[in-house]
Amino acid sequence: MKEKTIIIVGGGQAAAMAAASLRQQGFTGELHLFSDERHLPYERPPLSKSMLLEDSPQLQQVLPANWWQENNVHLHSGVTIKTLGRDTRELVLTNGESWHWDQLFIATGAAARPLPLLDALGERCFTLRHAGDAARLREVLQPERSVVIIGAGTIGLELAASATQRRCKVTVIELAATVMGRNAPPPVQRYLLQRHQQAGVRILLNNAIEHVVDGEKVELTLQSGETLQADVVIYGIGISANEQLAREANLDTANGIVIDEACRTCDPAIFAGGDVAITRLDNGALHRCESWENANNQAQIAAAAMLGLPLPLLPPPWFWSDQYSDNLQFIGDMRGDDWLCRGNPETQKAIWFNLQNGVLIGAVTLNQGREIRPIRKWIQSGKTFDAKLLIDENIALKSL
C-alpha cells in the first residue's frame, strides 16, 4: 500500500515543528513544505530583540540546515501558492506546478493588523512580522531619531525597549488605559509602565492618532490634540491571519482558520496551527494563542492527529518577553486582579502568583526564569498553597 503524502504550507515555527513532529512520531511517507520566504524556517521572537540590538545579527533557524535533507523533507522555498486544491487534493503554485497531497497542514501565520491611516505613509511606516522587517527597522533606528510606536502590547513594548537601547527618543501611543492589557495582570502592567518611563520612554495612554501629515518628519495629531514629530513610525495593534488560501478553499475562517482541539479544520484531511489558527472551544467560543510555544504545541498535536495517534496533553500556556535587562515569563491564567507578589519588583526580581481559592492557576516571573519549571508542574497538578508561605522569601519555593 502506497504511503500517504503530507504537505505543510508555511515557513515559520509551526510549519517547521510540524515536519519535525511528523518524523519524530514515525511518519515515513512523502513530506513537503512550501513557503513564500526564501529563508529556512527561522525563529520569530528574536526579531524585536537581538536582531535589532546585536552587532552582527544572524537568523536563528528552527531546525539545523542539514535536518531537512537528512529527514527526507522536501523544501520548496520562495514559492507562491495559487490554490490549496481542497476538492482535487492537488496544491497548485502560481508557476503552474501541482503537487498531490493526502493530508495538509496550514501554518501560514499572520500579518500585522493594518492601520490605513499609517499605511498611507508607505516605507516611512513599519510593522514587524518577518526578517526583512527587522532588517529595515535596524537601518532606521539610529541614535537621536524620534520614534513613535502605536500599540503597547508585547511587540510594541519590546520594540520600545530595543529602540531606546539604540538611543532613539521613543514615544508609545496606546488606546487602552494600560500597557500589555491583553496578556499581563495589573501589577505587571504597572511594573512595565514604570520600567519604560524610567528608561526615558514617553507612554501616552487612552490616546490614538487622528491625523497624519507626511513631510520631512511625519506629523501625527493625537485625539488629545497634541502633535508629535517622528522620524520613524512603527505600529503593532494585533494580527490579521493569513487565511486567504483557506477562505478560498471554503474552510471555516474567523480572522483565522477555525480548528478543533486536534487542530483539524472542517475538512478532516486539513489541519492548521500557529498564528493562522483559531480554536473553537467546547462552549463555542473562539480562542487564539499567539506564542512560540503554542506553535510548537499545535504542530505536535496536528502531527499526532494526522497519524491517528493519541493527542499529547497541553501544558499551561506560556510565553516570555525580554525588555531591557528584564526577562518576564508568563504561565497559566492571566485573568484576575488579586495577585500575590513574592520579592520586590523595584529590585527587578519578583514573582507574581494568581491563586484562586488557594489553587495556583497562573504566575509571572521577573528575572526568575529558573522557577518556571516547578510552577508549571504546580499549575498542571492544581496544587493548593497557603498564600503567606508562597510569598515568604525565607522559604525556598522548591520546598513548598
Swiss-Prot record:
Check the record and name the Gene3D superfamilies matching this protein.
3.30.390.30, FAD/NAD(P)-binding domain (3.50.50.60)
What catalytic activity is recorded?
A: 2 reduced [2Fe-2S]-[ferredoxin] + NAD(+) + H(+) = 2 oxidized [2Fe-2S]-[ferredoxin] + NADH
- What does the entry give for GO biological process? 3-phenylpropionate catabolic process
Q: Mind listing the GO molecular function terms for this protein?
A: 3-phenylpropionate dioxygenase activity; ferredoxin-NAD+ reductase activity; oxidoreductase activity, acting on NAD(P)H
Among InterPro entries, the record links this protein to:
FAD-oxidoreductase/Apoptosis, FAD/NAD-bd_sf, FAD/NAD-binding_dom, FAD/NAD-linked_Rdtase_dimer_sf, HcaD, Reductase_C, Ring-hydroxylating_dioxygenase
- Enzyme Commission number, as recorded: 1.18.1.3
Binding partners and assembly:
This dioxygenase system consists of four proteins: the two subunits of the hydroxylase component (HcaE and HcaF), a ferredoxin (HcaC) and a ferredoxin reductase (HcaD).
The molecule here is called: 3-phenylpropionate/cinnamic acid dioxygenase ferredoxin--NAD(+) reductase component
